[in-house]
A protein has these predicted regions:
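Hydrophobic transmembrane alpha-helices and their immediate loop junctions
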Residues: 1-606
Length: 606
């Protein structure tokens, strides 16, 4: 891609050097600007109710100032946090994921590219249109208007005021003009989310059945032909209502074979699944893990293998496994014909300054397998969590655990006085790996999709979904939290307790939803409309926030300069221009450094 862009840029340079670029095309590095005079008369007409526009501009300027202060503090505090505690690089912190380009950004799939481009177009039009209208409201001449292109991709629009004419306008008029773009972006955001949260998502319900978001390779479900996008609507002839209902019904069936009914669009089929206990993940420090750091040459378990027996007794479901391990703190697992023996419990890592770290023989970073607390058997991480719910901080408990001692596992007990976390819950002071001794398994083989969670978040029900109801919140708080929740949807797997990102209703996940009510006549078009509103709001809000960063050439930088000039002009100094430049340059460089740290810091400092 870099080679292509470089070749494209040199080709443009050659055309410009030979005078072959039309006068309406400008160049700033690899950025092309297309200039036009068309549209000025329309802006003159739109700007006629000047009293209204000035009132709107004053309101927007106040909003912009608040957001500017907020973004300044947020960026500085985030940069300081990254320097003090460099985070591990994640997909979100990859530089390419800063770009709002579907297919380049890992979180923006090509399947919703039309809706994203529509949202970007609307955002650019209302933003630059706001600048244009306020230029005419404040009697500032417009030199030209147009689009900015990176190669052939539209990345911006612009209204170019006549600079001499702009400087003649009063500071208040200039500030309103610079704030107009972000004000319009925020107004569009409110409008589209009101439509999305109201009539649009009010017409979308979750279809009955369990939503299959994925199937593990080599799993029982995969072998039976279950695919992503399927809905499991019945098990052994009994209807399935949702994901939780499927898990309950499967757990209640003792036989290895289950017959499931699957729907996908207009297709309905039945298939029989022979369950087998597939290892879907294993923590590296597990006593059963391949490549065990303790240096053992014993056989080990890897992801994708099947656990077929515990101490010679056949197992094929998670329920079987838990039952066979309930009375065995050390067990022998049969995997692909090989037998591996180890302690069974909740795999844990001792945390710095936690209660258990002060126990004899333990220090931060040590690995142990907790098998019992006060005599209560712990088979897996879920058992540990439910057992700890019965204790309070300050109580002393006896923790039974196994630690590695050379080539063998040593059983030890520790008396631990429990501490509390930020939520007031009792803690031992450990980081717990999921599963049994760090082994995660699936007897069925599907990864279920949180269709109801995503539907509720798209409807603005953030507090209902994650806040325990939220009934006491006012409508404004509920709306703002709903907007905040939708902003996180493209990164949901990293920011919420769900295993998927949500970029909108795409071909494979629309099978999980149904349309009802007066808008049902739109059919699948309602999903497209919901996507368009979602991405229009998402992009406009981010566009508004970004342009409020107090740094040139963003609108926030211009507003900062106007404000600085107004304050400095009242000070007893003859060097007002230099002081203003010092303020804006210092703030601008601080913002640039903060942004660079946010983008590249995790890769450079981790």
């Amino acid at each position: 891609m870099v080679i292509g862009i470089t070749a494209y840029w040199f080709a443009l340079l050659g055309l410009r050097a030979n005078g072959m670029l039309p006068s309406y095309i400008g160049m700033q590095g690899p950025i092309l600007t297309l200039h036009t005079q068309k549209g000025k008369k329309l802006l003159d007409k739109l700007s006629r109710p000047k009293r209204f526009w000035r009132a709107w501009g004053n309101f927007g300027l106040g909003i912009a100032l608040v957001v500017m202060i907020g973004t300044f503090l947020l960026l500085v505090l985030q940069a300081v946090s990254i320097i003090q505690n460099p985070p591990e690089p994640t997909a979100v912190t990859q530089p390419r994921n800063v770009l709002v380009i579907p297919g380049v950004n890992d979180f923006l799939p090509l399947s919703v590219a039309p809706e994203i481009l529509l949202g970007l177009l609307i955002g650019l039009v209302v933003h630059e249109g706001g600048h244009g209208i306020f230029c005419r409201v404040e009697d500032i001449e417009i030199k030209s208007m147009g689009l900015a292109l990176f190669a052939i991709l539209p990345i911006g629009a612009f209204v170019e005021p006549d600079e001499e004419n702009r400087r003649e306008a009063d500071r208040g008029g200039q500030s309103r003009m610079f704030a107009a773009g972000v004000t319009n972006n925020f107004a569009v955001t409110i409008l589209v989310f009101m439509l999305l949260f109201g009539p649009i998502m009010g017409s979308v319900t979750v279809a009955s059945g369990a939503a299959v978001g994925g199937v593990f390779d080599g799993s029982a479900a995969g072998d039976a032909g279950i695919e992503r996008g399927d809905r499991i609507v019945a098990v052994n002839g009994t209807d399935v209502e949702n994901n939780a209902d499927l898990n309950q019904k499967l757990a209640a069936i003792d036989s290895r074979s289950v017959t499931v009914t699957v729907e996908n669009g207009d297709e309905r089929r039945q298939t029989t699944i022979e369950r087998s206990l597939l290892v879907t993940a294993i923590t590296q420090t597990s006593p059963f893990a391949a490549g065990d750091e303790q240096g053992s040459d014993e056989p080990a378990i890897s992801t994708g293998e099947n656990i077929t027996a515990v101490n010679g007794t056949t197992v094929y479901t998670e329920k079987n496994l838990s039952q066979q391990l309930a009375d065995r703190k050390v067990a022998t697992l049969t995997v692909n014909g090989e037998q591996i023996t180890g302690p069974i419990g909740a795999l844990s890592t001792v945390q710095q300054d936690g209660p258990v770290s002060s126990a004899d023989g333990l220090s931060a970073g040590d690995t142990l397998v907790i098998t019992a607390i006060d005599g209560n058997r712990i088979v897996n991480s879920s058992d540990l969590s439910s057992t700890m719910d019965g204790y309070e901080a300050g109580q002393t408990v006896t923790v039974e655990a196994y630690t590695q001692d050379g080539d063998s596992d040593q059983r030890t007990t520790y008396d631990v006085t429990l501490d509390e976390n930020n939520s007031g819950e009792a803690i031992v002071g450990i980081l717990v790996a999921p599963g049994t001794s760090g082994i995660e398994t699936s007897g069925f083989g599907t990864n279920l999709y949180p269709a109801e969670t995503f539907r509720d978040l798209m409807a603005g029900q953030f507090m209902t979904t994650f806040g325990g109801g939220g009934g006491g919140d006012g409508p404004l708080t509920t709306f703002l939290l709903g907007v905040a929740g939708t902003l996180l949807l493209p990164f949901a797997s990293l920011s919420m307790p769900v295993g998927y990102n949500f970029a909108g209703f795409v071909a494979w996940n629309t099978n999980f939803y149904a349309i009802q009510g007066p808008l049902s006549g739109l059919g699948g078009g309602l999903f497209i409309l919901a996507n368009a509103l979602f991405w229009t709001g998402w992009i406009n809000l981010n566009l508004g926030f970004f342009n409020c960063i107090p740094a040139f050439p963003l609108d926030g930088g211009h507003i900062l300069r106007m404000g600085s000039e107004a304050i400095v002009s009242r000070l007893p100094t003859s060097q007002g221009r230099q002081v203003t430049t010092m303020i804006t340059t210092t703030v601008g460089l601080t913002m640039l450094a903060s942004l660079l740290l946010m983008i590249f810091g995790p890769q450079l400092l981790a």
